[in-house]
């Protein structure tokens, strides 16, 4: 039996450091073997996961000694937070650990999609020379719209402003008198932001209130030729409506790192859609961020278990 069970990949140096204070089982294959995971709960006081391990009531019932769930990241939709609270189990996200990675990912997507030239390698190597078709747009002076204005969005806003972008944000949970609005235009209505922004980036959790927040009506409201980038959670965007908007060329492009079903299947509604860049839920995952969130999580777990921090 181990004090700590780790079911997904994690920085090995951080794991080794945790082993100085706790007995640890580190098995990144457990996420793909639910039965084996559920049979591994005896004596485990802390479980460390990423976004694929489902921490639900079924799992909690098989981990009777569990006191903490360390989340290697910030999204909590794979964790039944209410069930954990009822059992007095601490849920410990690695807040701030992947902020830089996500912000850089979003800005890269904006540059790639607005300029339009970076994915031309096959055509150029085939002898085409489509200079006029790939002329694209500069990003300086463009307006970035942020849906949600938490820590990652605020860091992204600062970086975008340094590049000469105008930034506006919509977040009904940030009071109008919050100091965060001093440097960013506040859009009271989501529709106002969608109408004005040249690029829209999503930074909200998935909930009943945000499921399909960006639906067909919202996409139609967006500025013609604008971009949509989703690094938040699949389900916030209606993928069928997005595919239609891209095919109709109302949107200028989209970059999705998260999807309603992961991984995608060959018959996805997004298959064959031009103007789309798709990545496998990796916006927040770099070598540097993996180290940061691993060490943050190790410290969080140590504190929760009352050992050296």
UniProtKB/Swiss-Prot annotation:
Top EC class, one word: oxidoreductase
Pfam family, one: 2-Hacid_dh
EC number assigned by the record: 1.1.1.310
Alphabetized SUPFAM superfamilies for the sequence: Formate/glycerate dehydrogenase catalytic domain-like, NAD(P)-binding Rossmann-fold domains
GO MF: NAD binding; S-sulfolactate dehydrogenase activity
Presence of the UniProt keyword Disulfide bond in the record: no
Sequence positions that bind NAD(+): 151-152, 171, 231-233, 257, 281-284
Catalytic residue list: 233, 262, 281
Reaction catalyzed: (2S)-3-sulfolactate + NAD(+) = 3-sulfopyruvate + NADH + H(+)
Presence of keyword Oxidoreductase: yes
Keyword entries, A-Z: NAD, Oxidoreductase
Family statement drawn from the similarity comment of this UniProt entry: Belongs to the D-isomer specific 2-hydroxyacid dehydrogenase family.
Function per UniProt: Dehydrogenase of the (R,S)-sulfolactate degradation pathway that only acts on the (S)-enantiomer of 3-sulfolactate. Together with ComC, provides a racemase system that converts (2S)-3-sulfolactate to (2R)-3-sulfolactate, which is degraded further by (2R)-sulfolactate sulfo-lyase. Specific for NAD. Also able to form sulfolactate from sulfopyruvate.
Protein name: (S)-sulfolactate dehydrogenase
């Amino acid at each position: 039996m181990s004090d700590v069970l780790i079911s997904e990949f994690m920085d090995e140096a951080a794991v080794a450091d945790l082993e100085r204070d706790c007995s640890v089982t580190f098995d990144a294959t457990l996420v793909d073997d639910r039965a084996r995971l559920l049979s591994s709960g005896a004596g485990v006081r802390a479980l460390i996961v990423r976004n694929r391990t489902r921490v639900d009531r079924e799992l909690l019932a098989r981990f009777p000694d569990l006191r903490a769930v360390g989340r290697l990241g910030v999204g909590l939709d794979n964790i039944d937070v209410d069930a954990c609270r009822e059992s007095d189990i601490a849920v410990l996200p690695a807040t701030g650990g992947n902020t830089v990675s996500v912000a850089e990912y979003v800005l890269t997507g904006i540059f790639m999609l607005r300029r339009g030239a970076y994915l031309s390698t096959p055509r150029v190597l085939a002898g085409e020379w489509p200079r006029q078709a790939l002329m694209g747009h500069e990003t300086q002076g463009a307006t970035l719209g942020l849906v949600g204005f938490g820590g990652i969005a605020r860091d992204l806003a600062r970086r975008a402003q340094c590049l000469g972008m105008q930034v506006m944000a919509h977040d009904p949970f940030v009071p109008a008198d919050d100091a965060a609005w001093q440097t960013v235009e506040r859009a009271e209505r989501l529709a106002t932001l969608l109408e004005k922004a040249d690029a829209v980036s999503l930074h909200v959790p998935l909930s009943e209130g945000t499921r399909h927040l960006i639906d067909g009506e919202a996409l139609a409201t967006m500025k013609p030729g604008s971009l949509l980038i989703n690094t938040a959670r699949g389900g916030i965007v209606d993928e069928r409506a997005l595919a239609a908007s891209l095919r109709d060329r109302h949107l200028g492009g989209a970059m999705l790192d998260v999807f309603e079903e992961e991984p995608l299947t060959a018959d996805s509604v997004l298959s064959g859609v031009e103007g789309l860049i798709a990545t496998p839920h990796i916006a927040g995952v770099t070598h540097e961020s993996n180290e940061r969130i691993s060490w943050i999580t190790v410290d969080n777990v140590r504190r929760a278990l009352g050992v050296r921090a």
